[in-house]
Amino acid sequence: MTTQLDLIKSSIKSIPNYPKEGIIFRDITTLLEVPAAFKATIDLIVEQYRDKGITKVLGTESRGFIFGAPVALALGLPFELVRKPKKLPRETISQSYQLEYGQDTLEMHVDAISEGDNVLIIDDLLATGGTVEATVKLVQRLGGTVKHAAFVINLPELGGEKRLNNLGVDCYTLVNFEGH
């Protein structure tokens, strides 16, 4: 019998040498083409966080929106966006972070988080953890806390889970893929 996790993992295509030589791209768009796999993804994340005292769900640009919004809806919680610069219409707060070659910046609305909010961050994939670390810093600057982050995919050898654990963030991942 196929488990929900088997269904999810088998629905994710691995594309070798994309976007560049030596990279194996994990394509979640194929998971979205299998309604039972997409539903299982949302259901498993919702079940994990139903009784954790979460007050807001954040999705990181852009595939975190795909999974974060339905999770927030199922939990009956507000959903907030973390985006690249100049994509949000109201006043924002920004956080820069280092990439392998350069720097990037994330933004969110200044009124997205209230003092004392217990925030769940959702993204499709955990690699180095840089995006989520920057998101944690944004939340903290606005007075919230992040104890939990959920991912569809983890690439364990890239160290993101350890990096986030060192920040006090517990990571929940549905499937691990070796190789990147």
From Swiss-Prot:
Its EC number is 2.4.2.7. Keywords: Cytoplasm, Glycosyltransferase, Purine salvage, Transferase. Pathway: Purine metabolism; AMP biosynthesis via salvage pathway; AMP from adenine: step 1/1. SUPFAM superfamilies: PRTase-like. It is found in: Cytoplasm. One of its GO terms (biological process) is purine ribonucleoside salvage. One of its GO terms (cellular component) is cytosol. The keyword Repeat does not apply. One of its GO terms (molecular function) is adenine phosphoribosyltransferase activity. Pfam families: Pribosyltran. CDD domains: PRTases_typeI (cd06223). InterPro entries: Ade_phspho_trans, Adenine_PRTase, PRibTrfase_dom, PRTase-like. Coiled coil: none annotated. It catalyses: AMP + diphosphate = 5-phospho-alpha-D-ribose 1-diphosphate + adenine. Homodimer. NCBIfam families: apt, PRK02304.1-1, PRK02304.1-3, PRK02304.1-5. Catalyzes a salvage reaction resulting in the formation of AMP, that is energically less costly than de novo synthesis. Belongs to the purine/pyrimidine phosphoribosyltransferase family. This is Adenine phosphoribosyltransferase. The gene is apt.
